[in-house]
Every structure is written in C-alpha cells, then in structure tokens.
Design a protein with these regions (language model features):
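Bacterial N-terminal signal peptides
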Residues: 7-19
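N-terminal segment of the mature folded domain
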Residues: 23-151, 289-294
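Short beta-strand->loop
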Residues: 29-31, 122-124, 142-169, 183-187, ...
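Sec-exported extracytoplasmic/periplasmic mature domains
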Residues: 42-51, 74-78, 87, 94-98, ...
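Periplasmic-binding protein-like
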Residues: 112-116, 177-184, 191-192, 224-257, ...
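Short helix-loop capping/hinge motifs at secondary-structure junctions, enriched
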Residues: 125-131, 150, 163-171, 250-258
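Ligand-binding pocket segment of bilobal, Venus flytrap-like solute-binding proteins
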Residues: 168-235
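Extracellular/periplasmic juxtamembrane helices and adjacent flexible linkers that interface
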Residues: 250-295
C-alpha cells in the first residue's frame, strides 16, 4: 500500500474509532447567541451522564436565528432537542407534528429554564443621550437589531417597543403600530441573528444603538471591555423566556429519547442553573437569582 493510501486508511480508521467512542449522539438546534451557554453546558452534562449511566455522549450544536432554526428542523435537520428564545417557534414545530402539543408542560416553568430582558447598548458616553424607546424612533437615529421575522431577539425588540407605546398616554394598537413602524425604519439593515447584530455594532461600527438581550450585553462586556460602551435599561421591556423541547420524531427514530430528556432536565439542576447565571442569564433557582443580584 502506498503512502497516500496508508494516510487515507489511517484517517478513516480514526473517524470510525472516534464515532465508536460515543454511545449516542444528540444535536441541539438553538438560537444564535446561545453558543456560549451550551459550549459550557455540554461538557458538564456529558460528565454527569457518564457518571450516572456509564454512557458516552457526543453533543452537537446548530445555531442561527430562532425562526430559521425551527424551519430547518421542519425541513429535515435531525435535531433531538430545540432550545429557542420564543415559544411561537416551538409551537410551529408542534403544529408540524414534530414536537408534542403539550411541550410546555413537559418541563418546569413552561419549559423555560431561564429568562432575560431587552436592553440598549450605546457607544461610550451615550453621545446621543438615549434613555427610552421614544429616543430610538427619533429622526436620524440608527438602530441595530436582528430581523423580527426570523429571530427571537428581533421579535422581543418589536414586542417590547409595542408594549411601551401602549403604556403611553392615549396609547392604543394604532399608535403602537405607528411607533414601531417609525422605530424599524431607523434600522439601516436587519442582522441575520443576535450575534451578527453584535458584530455589526461592535466590530463594524454601524448604528447608534444595539438592542439585545441583557445576557448578550454582559458577553459584550467580557469580549470588548466595559469601557467601550454603556448599557441602558429602558423603562419597560418584555421578560424573555427561552423554551426548550424534545423533537419527538427525531428521538423516536434515533432511539435517543432517554438522553434527550435528561439533557433538557439537567438545565434545571443546580449545575445547569449556575451555568445559566455564569452566562448572564436569569436562573429560575431563587437562591442563585439572589446570588447573582446584579440582574
């Protein structure tokens, strides 16, 4: 056998051996800015599961705009679990028969292991003096957000702005619609996802304000330094939930229901909740929520 063929054979044997090391493989289809959360969570769960069952798990991730992700699952992406940032995306899968109709009752807290809220990220010194939603709809302002139709981040921005407009004197659906329309016209572009929006604002330098999850703001501070921007908490915003579900059609086909269920249940464990808090999400565990009082 020549050297080239030997090299190919070695690579193939390595791939077979690597695959054989895992007793099962799970794919988690998740929203864009959850990369860091599950990068930390997966090794933690693998260690727990190995100690409990003796099984080795291979855990894979797929990330993107929440609505794009569920459409990919509906189109054949074989995700064992979905971990999203808006309930209507999981309802979409339930309507397709991929997720149980009562998915929100399968786990505690309506199947949302942690929460967050929406904040404004502005340049150092807040040069345009942004304080609340009305400032962002003013002429000449550029806002950076992901597309409201494709992402939970963008949709929660839309809903928070709508809710704020309704609370104003004389507020009604018509005035809220007009206000949100003005706000969205101030977006020079719609980012593909939450992390893309962060890159657009922080690295490309586009826009006057980035609207994003509170948790993403903390990740920006970690990566870019707190001195390079400021965080503004508007007077009213939506509590963002992050629902999870098992993709029944996939786990039944692969025989991974036991592992997939445990993977999601562990999000509510002390370790899982601590990981959420370490990634700047608001845990459901009241003791941990108190511990991380900066929320």
């Amino acid at each position: 056998m020549n050297t080239f063929r030997k090299s190919i054979a070695t690579v193939l044997l390595g791939l077979v051996a690597s695959a054989a090391l895992a007793d099962a493989t799970l794919l988690n289809a998740s929203y864009d800015v959850a990369r860091d959360v599950y990068k930390d969570y997966n090794p933690m769960f693998q260690k727990y599961w190995k100690a409990k069952t003796g099984e080795s798990l291979e855990l894979k991730q797929s990330h993107g705009g929440s609505s794009k992700q569920v459409r990919a699952v509906a189109d054949g992406l074989e995700a064992d679990v979905v971990t999203m940032n808006q309930a209507n995306d999981i309802e979409f899968l339930a309507d397709k028969g991929l997720v149980a109709k009562d998915w929100a009752r399968k786990f505690p807290n309506s199947a949302s292991p942690y929460t967050s809220t929406m904040v404004f990220i502005v340049r150092k010194g807040n040069p345009k003096g942004f304080k609340d939603w009305n400032d962002l709809a003013a002429p000449g302002v550029q806002i950076i957000i992901p597309h409201p139709k494709n992402t939970g981040n963008g949709r929660n921005t839309y809903l928070s702005a709508w809710a704020w407009a309704l609370k104003q004197p004389g507020g009604n659906d018509k005035s809220a619609q007009e206000f949100v329309g003005k706000l969205l016209k101030n977006a020079p572009l719609f980012a593909a996802g939450g992390r893309d929006a962060t890159t657009t604002f922080m690295q490309r330098g586009l826009g006057d304000v980035l609207i994003t999850f509170e948790s993403e703001a903390e990740m920006i501070a970690k990566e870019f330094g707190k001195g390079n921007f400021e965080v503004i908490h508007p007077s009213l915003t939506m509590q963002t939930e992050f629902p999870v579900a098992i993709v029944d059609k996939v786990v039944d086909k692969k025989g991974t229901r036991k592992q997939a269920t445990a993977y999601l249940e562990y999000l509510w464990s002390k370790e899982g909740q601590e990981n959420a808090a370490q990634n700047y999400l608001r845990p459901r565990d009241p003791e941990l929520l108190k511990k991380y009082a900066h929320f």
